[in-house]
C-alpha cells in the first residue's frame, strides 16, 4: 500500500501549481508528506476534515475544505480513512 500511496502522491505533485501534498490516517498521523506540506500539521489537517464532516452529517459525499491565502491555497478532503491536503500556488 505504501508504494501505491507514494505513487499517487507523486502523480498529484506533478500537477500544475501543486507545491505540496500530505496524507494522514484517521488518527491524524502523517502517512506521507512532500514539498511544502509539513508533517507536523497532520493532526490539524485531519481535525479540519473531521469538523467539516460534522457540519454536513447527512451528506453522502465528503466535504472539500479550501483555505486560501496570498501565498498558498490548501485543499483538504477525506476518503477511505485517509485525509489528503494539497498545497497549490494561487492562480
Swiss-Prot record:
* CC annotations in GO: lysosome; Ragulator complex
A matching Pfam family = LAMTOR5
> What are its GO biological-process terms?
cellular response to amino acid stimulus; negative regulation of apoptotic process; positive regulation of TOR signaling; positive regulation of TORC1 signaling; protein localization to lysosome; regulation of cell size
The portions of this protein that span the membrane are none
Q: Does the keyword Metal-binding apply?
A: no
Q: Which UniProt keywords apply?
A: Cytoplasm, Lysosome
Does Zinc-finger count among this protein's keywords? Answer: no
Q: What is its main location?
A: cytoplasm
Family note: Belongs to the LAMTOR5 family.
Q: What does this protein do?
A: Regulator of the TOR pathway, a signaling cascade that promotes cell growth in response to growth factors, energy levels, and amino acids. As part of the Ragulator complex, may activate the TOR signaling cascade in response to amino acids.
Q: How does it assemble?
A: Part of the Ragulator complex.
Q: What is this protein called?
A: Ragulator complex protein LAMTOR5 homolog
Organism of origin is Nematostella vectensis (Starlet sea anemone)
